[in-house]
Amino acid sequence: MKNIIITGGAGFIGSHVVRLFVNKYPNYMIINLDKLTYAGNLANLKDIENKPNYRFVKMDICDFEGVLKLMQEEHVDGIIHLAAESHVDRSIKDPFTFAQTNVMGTLSLLQAAKAYWESLPEKFEGKRFYHISTDEVYGALEMTHPEGIKPPFTTKASSGEHHLAYGEKFFTEDLKYQPHSPYSAAKASSDHFVRAFHDTFGLPTIVTNCSNNYGPYQFPEKLIPLFINNIRHRKPLPVYGKGENVRDWLYVVDHARAIDLIFHEGKVAETYNIGGFNEWKNIDIIKVVINTVDRLLGRPEGADMDLITYVTDRAGHDMRYAIDSTKLQKELGWEPSLQFEEGIEKTVRWYLDNQEWLDNVTSGDYQKYYDNMYSNR
C-alpha cells in the first residue's frame, strides 16, 4: 500500500489527478488535501468520493503542524503538490495571497515531508515529493513569426487544422527563470525551494513545468470556460489587447497521465516539461470556441463573433509561451493522447451538459470578481 497526499485535489488539474490515481491504483490510499478556496470544489469528485481508497482532508498547506500530523497518522510515502493560487489576474490584484500560498505553503509541505521521512528508519528511501509548476516561470518567448511557421515537432495534441509555431525558440528545462507576473514569481520561488531541499537535505524531489491546460471542471475565470459560459449567455467576450498572445494548450487528462508516469518513473532531482506543441493565438482559439459552442447549441456558425470585445491589455502580459517536451517523450515515452480539435469538442460539450455546475460556481462572489476585472476596461 502506498499512501499519497495530493494537494489541491479539489481543483481543476488536481481533481483529474485524484480521479486517475483512485481508479488506477486501488491498492493506494489517496488523501486529497485541499483548503477549498473559491476554485476548489468537491463536486468535481462526486464520482469517486465513496471509494475505499480515497479520503478528503480539508486543510491549508500552510499549516505545518497539521500536515506533519497527517503524514505521521497516514504513514505518507509521497506527495504530489498541485495546490496553488494560479490566476495571473488575481495575482496582480493580490500578490500577498500568492506569496503566502504558493511559496510559504510549499515550504510548509517540504519541511513536513523532511521532518517525517527523516524520522523513519528508512528515511527517504521509497519516498517522493513531486511539485507541479508552470511554464510561466521561464518568462516570455519572442514571437518572431506572427504569421506562423511550420513547427519542428508534432504530437497527438497538435491541432490537425492549425498546426503552427510563432517563433523558433521553445521553453526547455535548462532555461533560466525570468518570471514576469506575481503568480509566476511565486511559482518560481516555490520551484527553487523544492530544488534547494533536494540539494541541501537530499529530499527526493521532482519538478514539472506544464503549458496551459483545458478541459472539464476548470473554474470559469480561465479563458476557455469563461468564454463558453459567456457565449452561452450571449455576454461580451473580453479579449486582452489585440488577442495576439500565444499559448501552448494541453488537454488536462493528458497532463494527469504525465503526472502519473513521472511520479512513478521520473528521476529524482530532474525537471520535466509537459506540453503539446499546440500553439494558438488567443484570438484564434476564441474563434474556435465560438464556432464550437454555436454549432452545438444549434446557432448559425459564427453567430456570436460579434461578442468579441477588445479590452485594455493585462499588465506585463507575456507574448508567447511554447513548451518543448522532447525530454519527457524520449526518456519516459509520454505523449499526449487527444488531438486539440477532439479535446475542444469534449470540453465544450462537458460545460454545456453541466450547466448546473457552471451556474453554481459562477454565483455570488464570482460575479463581483468578474465585474471588478472586466468593467470599465
For each predicted feature, which ranges?
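C-terminal substrate-binding subdomain of Rossmann-fold SDR/epimerase-dehydratase oxidoreductases
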Residues: 4, 17, 30, 40, ...
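N-terminal Rossmann-like NAD(P)+-binding domain of SDR-like oxidoreductases, especially those catalyzing
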Residues: 1-213, 253, 263, 282, ...
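Conserved GTPase G-domain signal focused on the G5
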Residues: 217
